[in-house]
């Protein structure tokens, strides 16, 4: 795999994390820079690990991974999205935003990275250095997620609760689209 292909793959795998991070940054209103870096690190590490898991599983587990990844992604993203929507509509003004919970951050990172596991399975059939590819995916996702949080910060300063509701709907929609895509394929 050429260096250009590795970079293209890495940034392609980070798009979901970027979109979710923009929503999280907006929902938090004014996330600190340390929160953006922490979010980027969590998304980056999870996004780097999942293709390695898929690569290791290879052919033996490909049918299992493909059979359940869409259900796992839908369940995680739908739960987090509905929880954010609920919090945006019914939380008290001084309540802590849902997105600051590490559990929510981790569930969202896992939900957006399950497709990377399937990519990892396909990489098992190619002559690639999985460490290089996984590192590139992790770094790209770190940059995109951290940047997404900071972009979302600008939006959230003006639209806090609305942004949290939209982010919740977007997460649910992302999970639903993953589920529909796999069920109709």
UniProtKB/Swiss-Prot annotation:
It is found in: Cell inner membrane. Belongs to the MntP (TC 9.B.29) family. Its main location: membrane. Keywords: Cell inner membrane, Cell membrane, Ion transport, Manganese, Membrane, Transmembrane, Transmembrane helix, Transport. It holds the Pfam family Mntp. The chain crosses the membrane at residues 3-23, 41-61, 70-90, 101-121, 123-143, 165-185. Disulfide bonds: none annotated. This is Putative manganese efflux pump MntP. One of its GO terms (molecular function) is manganese ion transmembrane transporter activity. The keyword Nucleotidyltransferase does not apply. GO terms for cellular component: plasma membrane. The keyword Transferase does not apply. The lineage of its organism: Bacteria, Pseudomonadati, Pseudomonadota, Alphaproteobacteria, Hyphomicrobiales. It is a multi-pass membrane protein. InterPro entries: Mntp/YtaF (IPR003810), Put_MntP (IPR022929). Probably functions as a manganese efflux pump.
